[in-house]
Amino acid sequence: MAFANLRKVLISDSLDPCCRKILQDGGLQVVEKQNLSKEELIAELQDCEGLIVRSATKVTSDIINAAEKLQVVGRAGTGVDNVDLEAATRKGILVMNTPNGNSLSAAELTCGMIMCLARQIPQAAASMKDGKWERKKFMGTELNGKVLGILGLGRIGREVATRMQSFGMKTIGYDPIISPEVSASFGVQQLPLEQIWPLCDFITVHTPLLPSTTGLLNDSTFAQCKKGVCVVNCARGGIVDEGALLRALQSGQCAGAALDVFTEEPPRDRALVNHENVISCPHLGASTKEAQSRCGEEIALQFVDMVKGKALAGVVNAQALASIFCPHTKPWVSLAKALGALMQAWAGSPKGAIQVVTQGSSLKNSGSCLAPAVIIGLLKDASQQSNVNLVNAMLLVKEAGLDVTTSHNPATPREQDFGECLLTVALAGAPYQAVGLVQGTKPVLQALNGAVFRPEVPLHPGQPLLMFRAQASNPAMLPTMIGLLAEAGVQLLSYQSSVVSDGETWHVMSISSLLPSLAPWKPHVTEAFQFCF
């Protein structure tokens, strides 16, 4: 999945010129058009495989479903809440961002907001412009010794922590993913949220906008906070409940707030913006020359590396895909697709649980990318799932009535000596199991239901294979099968058979084209199927 057919990219928001240049130097056509309406954006995307946006363009499900050629959406920045991830994933469209591009700029703005809240700098400056000299009105507070609560300890959160520690602030925080040991390494003590609220003099949020983070600061949590707490939101509008914040400001429970983001941008309700203890900016978190250049450069390089098959970085909705660009993994992905297609042809649109088992040290962490490849083989022939790919496979397989489990078996000492790795695909509770491996860079089939092929059967993309099981004691069987091929006008290209298992043998014929029907074969064999992947 090297996205080799991605040729044209639309940039629909203002980006640094380096973005266009890098894309063009990488062999891609680039169109730059900003401030497009929904209808105009859909029209422009009809001949584009790629789209790069900042935060202004809203990539909705309507746009995604109408953009027939679209394969990749790139967000030059961190947050992707302006992209409908579910719709993109369902359609098999990759979504990527630049998680590092604006981290420093967002962190520096947050630190500036904290300092402005402590010393009321914007209010004092505005007073001076009005010709006033109000020294007593703008009495501030030192940051030294104050407690800063940081909710979200990713890249931006930790940059804020290290900077504010230099002011003598004590930093505490919460993050459901970052471990306490990791956060302690950059000076943040993690505590449960209910313990954080009453301790903080300042609270800053650095989380994505999710159902679990929407309204994270609300009437209930403000009531638990220390009276006079100051709040900063340079992350996403909606994390702080704006109605609750206004009530806390009016009651004095919250002494001040600094907001760079809002639930609605620009906000039509000006009550918060106009409050004397609120500092507000028009979403400037990433608005520095350095961040814009960095984000534009990073997303362009990610597109070019992806198209050339070098690497896949910044993936939001299919992280496991990054490993398919590893030279070791590519042939295993091809093998997984082949075994999935084999299983679909053999079991006849199976239902239930599909088991994907890896074996061998080099495949220890490969199940997450091989399972979607197996699903592609399983679902590709189903007309309603013809668009299945590595992005949407795990979503579509559930709708097809299948559960997919992955597991790993460590290699035995003997297998470790020989470096043998295996991929097994099986249908739980049914007699369908296929085992394959990679020889050099070539996928091969090793066994079906324990019947081993020696030598293994090559699995070439686009090469039809006919497989059937029959009694090993029937010497007339093979001439009969060859005769049936001739009657159908199909050439036999190669032939292999397995060792005898339970008195029967599996036979594999590489043929020039798929047979129109297997009905003539059924009286002569125990079972038969054909497939091509």
UniProtKB/Swiss-Prot annotation:
Its EC number is 1.1.1.95, 1.1.1.399, 1.1.1.37. The modification Phosphoserine is found at S14. It catalyses: (2R)-3-phosphoglycerate + NAD(+) = 3-phosphooxypyruvate + NADH + H(+); (R)-2-hydroxyglutarate + NAD(+) = 2-oxoglutarate + NADH + H(+); (S)-malate + NAD(+) = oxaloacetate + NADH + H(+). The modification Phosphothreonine is found at T78. The modification N-acetylalanine is found at A2. Keywords: Acetylation, Amino-acid biosynthesis, Isopeptide bond, NAD, Oxidoreductase, Phosphoprotein, Serine biosynthesis, Ubl conjugation. There is a cross-link at K21 (Glycyl lysine isopeptide (Lys-Gly) (interchain with G-Cter in SUMO2)). The modification N6-acetyllysine is found at K21, K58. The keyword Magnesium does not apply. Transmembrane segments: none annotated. Pathway: Amino-acid biosynthesis; L-serine biosynthesis; L-serine from 3-phospho-D-glycerate: step 1/3. NAD(+) binds at T78, R155, I156, D175, T207, C234, A235, R236, D260, H283, L284, G285, A286. PROSITE patterns: D_2_HYDROXYACID_DH_1, D_2_HYDROXYACID_DH_2, D_2_HYDROXYACID_DH_3. One of its GO terms (molecular function) is L-malate dehydrogenase (NAD+) activity. The active site is at R236, E265, H283. One of its GO terms (biological process) is L-serine biosynthetic process. Belongs to the D-isomer specific 2-hydroxyacid dehydrogenase family. Homotetramer. Catalyzes the reversible oxidation of 3-phospho-D-glycerate to 3-phosphonooxypyruvate, the first step of the phosphorylated L-serine biosynthesis pathway. Also catalyzes the reversible oxidation of 2-hydroxyglutarate to 2-oxoglutarate and the reversible oxidation of (S)-malate to oxaloacetate. This is D-3-phosphoglycerate dehydrogenase. It comes from Bos taurus.
